[in-house]
């Protein structure tokens, strides 16, 4: 049984210029709060304090609130309209912002949801491959987990146990989940295509809640209850994603990653994948 995350990467990066100075300004939308309000990252020179009003070439906005590194802003244009008209694909910062790469950062089976980053293991699958798996009597199921920016936030605490993972919205069809449980009892192996799928399935098996938010942080010592195999890319150091690898593979991950490097395998979002056996 292969389970994939169908949440679609939205065009949440807005690049524009200040109307008064012409200075570059970027809005990275993280979450839509209402038609005219969103949570976002802001990148421009100048003050970024509560009450600041900015006029740009595409939208006027006001900073309503500020957290450590995120902002709540109100706009004079609907957020969805901004995304549809001006948004571009939010490639990771270590990938050159080349429009020719945008389609490669979106799985062609994705639909619905609101992800601001890709579930990169799913990028190894396309509709043709999924059809071939189904012809071979493999069972395909889908979850939705809206990938947030927190998924890739580095672990900055001294001990990985002290790290906190941001809440992310997830959902799975109740009947699909029951079928997955039934198939597992019948001896089928459950393959999670990506850490987002792994975290969703493990959240649901523990809570029996089919739609909600999860901040499940998987680290060494975690007891897996449902998933048998994980397909995932090679991850950056000091990340909660690598903590998942550590929980499955142990300290041997370093030798594994060094071996991958020696074979010129590619890391991170557009990189190669590895299959881990969990149970």
PLM regions with names:
Residues 1-279:
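Surface-exposed, charge/polar-rich loops and edge strands
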């Amino acid at each position: 049984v292969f389970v994939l995350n169908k949440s679609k990467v939205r065009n949440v990066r807005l690049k524009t210029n200040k109307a008064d100075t012409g200075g570059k300004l970027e809005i990275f939308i993280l979450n839509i709060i209402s038609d005219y309000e969103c949570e976002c990252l802001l990148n421009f020179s100048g003050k970024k304090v509560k009450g600041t009003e900015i006029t740009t070439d595409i939208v006027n906005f006001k900073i309503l609130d500020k957290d450590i590194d995120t902002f709540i802003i109100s706009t004079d244009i609907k957020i969805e309209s901004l995304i549809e008209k001006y948004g571009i694909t939010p490639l990771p910062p270590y990938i050159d912002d080349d429009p020719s790469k945008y389609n490669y950062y979106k799985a062609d089976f994705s639909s619905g949801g609101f992800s601001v980053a890709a579930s990169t293991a799913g990028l190894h699958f396309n509709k043709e491959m999924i059809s071939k798996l189904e012809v071979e009597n493999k069972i395909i199921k889908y979850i939705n987990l809206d990938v947030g920016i927190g998924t890739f936030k580095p672990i900055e605490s001294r001990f990985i146990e002290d790290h906190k993972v941001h809440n992310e919205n997830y959902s799975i069809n109740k009947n699909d989940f029951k079928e997955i449980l039934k198939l597992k009892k019948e001896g089928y192996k459950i393959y999670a295509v990506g850490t987002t799928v792994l975290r969703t399935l493990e959240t649901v098996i523990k809570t029996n809640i089919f739609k909600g938010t999860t901040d499940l942080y998987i680290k060494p010592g975690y007891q897996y209850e449902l998933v048998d195999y994980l397909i995932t890319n090679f991850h950056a150091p000091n990340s909660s994603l690598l903590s998942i690898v550590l929980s499955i593979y142990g300290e041997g991950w370093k030798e594994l990653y060094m071996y991958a490097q020696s074979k010129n395998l590619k890391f991170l979002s557009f990189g190669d994948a590895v299959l881990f056996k969990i149970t």
